[in-house]
């Protein structure tokens, strides 16, 4: 079937409005859990994943892999690469921010056809922005085309790693937002040139990686491999262009004398 991208956007907004937004800054302690120390999940995450997964499969079919279901059973990721249609969901990206009352959180959804990310959505409910990318068709924010220029000098790079505290003449390090649903758009809209991530889980990165590539950027492991849905453990460099990648590599701890 032909998938109406606006209809999918509406499904995301609907789940957010009913399940996530009413719980923002109103969570009780018993609604907040930790999968491991510092790795938060809330009742809103779990319900939103269930409801969004049910909504997209009712609308278009396919299989669903969500962050919380994959945490419970990592083997479900194996089916994504071979499925004709798969949906990868991060019900609340930036859950730690959400728990602590920060507006920097979002809902992310990727559509994969036989292991290739063909569409990606990022909904930022407290900022009111819907980001969308389609392979070969570019990126939009609230329906408006998104483009960006070459990287800045010095390169504007964000991370949560301690390297952001190290002065560099070629890279201006800053603290990332602890939320891929915010940090990826910051690269797309020319605010940052680079984001370095410590993990590469598909629900965190597939929608944003497509967006960055669609505005001319690159998304690779620090070892140089192109990022894809099978990558689940490596560190990533998300960059506006090759020059930004090169300068960032010079300042990473493994490349410093």
Task: Pin down the residues of each PLM region.
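N-terminal subdomain of lithium-sensitive/metallo-dependent phosphomonoesterases centered on the IMPase/IPPase/PAP
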Residues: 1-92
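Residue-level signal for inorganic ion chemistry
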Residues: 20, 45, 56, 95, ...
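Generic detector of well-ordered alpha-helical packing
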Residues: 46, 68, 91-94, 125, ...
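DPxDG-like acidic metal-binding loop motif
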Residues: 80-136
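Short strand-turn-strand beta-turns centered on an Asx-Gly dipeptide
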Residues: 142-143
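An extended, acidic
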Residues: 148-252
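Single conserved hydrophobic/aromatic residue that forms the stacking wall/gate
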Residues: 254-257
